[in-house]
Amino acid sequence: MRKGTRIALRVLGGLVGLILLVVLGSYVVSEMRMRKHYDDVRGTVVAIPGDSASIVRGKVIATLYGCTGCHTPTLAGMTMIDQFPFARLPSSNITSGQGGIAATYTDADWDRAVRHGVRRDGTPLFLMPSHEFNRMSDDEFGRLLAYVKSVPPVDKAPGSRTIYPLARVLHTFGAPLVPAEKIDHSTQANPQPPRGASLAYGEYLAGACKFCHGADLGGQKVGGEAGAPPSPPIGRASAVARWTEAQFFQTMRTGVTPEGRKLDPKYMPWPEIGQLGDDELRGLHLYLKQGVSQSASADR
């Protein structure tokens, strides 16, 4: 065997060994982190209203915050990701039907799961965006739970969950795949700003937009479904921010943009956003125009 060939084989063997070491180490580290217990997170019991107006409002919140996107409109769950070598991840059935969690969850359990990303057994949920719910006001969270509890039961068992090597490596090296790790669990929920046409209330509402449009509202690829279109930028440097108030209202209530493009309600929940009051939409529009800035290059 030639010397060059021997060196190449040694280098190749070293690389294979290094990869195996990284994968094995990532498995051990990620398993420890995913099995960590957050027993100090007790969960807060909030008042859950029973009136029809609160339930309707809760449905709007569930749509704005992506509950119906990840768990489906029936809240029975679906396979969110099925991509090797990343993961196979089903979302939970959150109704009270067979295979669902609602029948066994206490109000404190709901708070731990939704606003803290922690299961009933104290271990963290994987890819549950609780960091976006964590500061939701108790009043709004109560309305959300009122809606979830009102949804008819669906009998559906969740599929199996498998975390493949790539997800474990990404998790080990900092990818925020377990949001419970990045939440300050001692932080109290935000008091909800007065509902109305203010920058503060617009910022509060825009928290829901960040699920799909990104933390800076600069747009991003949305996971969960093959073929789902990327979300466009909607912050201060975007075309959306240049719409007039009347154009913004028209788009949110008809699903047709000033440019004549029809929004697909499967990906952009304009029917639910359109149920917001005029002052709420004014506040949201004000925030999108003034409150968030992403690079001008995001205007695409």
Write out the residue ranges for each language-model feature:
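N-terminal type II signal-anchor transmembrane helix
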Residues: 2-38
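Extended surface/linker regions that mediate inter-domain or inter-protein docking
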Residues: 13, 17-27, 136, 140-199, ...
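C-terminal capping alpha-helices of c-type cytochrome domains
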Residues: 27, 31, 106-116, 132-158, ...
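Electrostatic cytochrome c docking/interface patches
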Residues: 37-63, 172-206
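Gly/Gly-Pro-rich "capping" loops immediately C-terminal to redox-active cysteine motifs
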Residues: 44, 48, 74-107, 124-137, ...
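Interaction-mediating elements
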Residues: 55, 127-129, 146, 156, ...
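Periplasmic/extracellular electron-transfer cofactor-ligation site
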Residues: 63-88, 116-124, 151-155, 203-229, ...
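Short, solvent-exposed interaction modules
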Residues: 112-121, 176-192, 251-252, 256-258
